[in-house]
A protein has these predicted regions:
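Active-site metal-binding motif and surrounding structural segment of the metallo-beta-lactamase
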Residues: 64, 68-72, 76-124
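Conserved beta-strand hairpin/beta-sheet module of binuclear metal-dependent hydrolase folds
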Residues: 20-87
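Sec-dependent signal peptide recognition
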Residues: 2-10
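Hydrophobic h-region of N-terminal signal peptides that target proteins for export
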Residues: 9-18
Length: 124
């Protein structure tokens, strides 16, 4: 976590942040495998599986509302829902991110990239 915060600080130290037009939008905060984890036998998993459907894998977007642009940190397996969430709650139209930053090579951080291929985003 400390390495991520240092990376985040270094990345944005030279980028001017203007009040209200740029902000961080949290799209997910669960571990790579999502919530509840596959095969979970704990009580909190078994009680009500559906109540966790809006807990998405860790990802954030840095939004610039003046320019109608954003960058995405992490391309998670939940990227379809996360980009739709940005569409419905931020821009009111579907926009692709200007860039996607992957912080490290765990599967939950890059597997969403597959949705940008011909079989998903490129399909007609």
């Amino acid at each position: 976590m400390i390495r991520f915060l240092k990376f985040f600080f270094i990345l944005f130290i030279n980028i001017p942040i203007y009040a209200q037009s740029e902000y961080i939008y949290i799209l997910g905060n669960t571990q790579d495998a999502g919530m509840p984890h596959i095969g979970c036998k704990h009580k909190f998993c078994l009680d009500n599986f559906s109540k966790y459907e809006e807990f998405y894998v860790t990802s954030i977007a840095v939004i610039n509302s003046d320019l109608n642009k954003y960058i995405l940190f992490e391309a998670t397996p939940d990227i379809t829902y996360q980009l739709n969430h940005i569409k419905n709650n931020v821009f009111q139209e579907f926009l692709l991110p200007e860039a996607i930053y992957i912080t490290h090579a765990h599967i939950g951080h890059y597997s969403g990239l597959m949705y940008f291929g011909r079989e998903a985003l490129g399909s007609k």
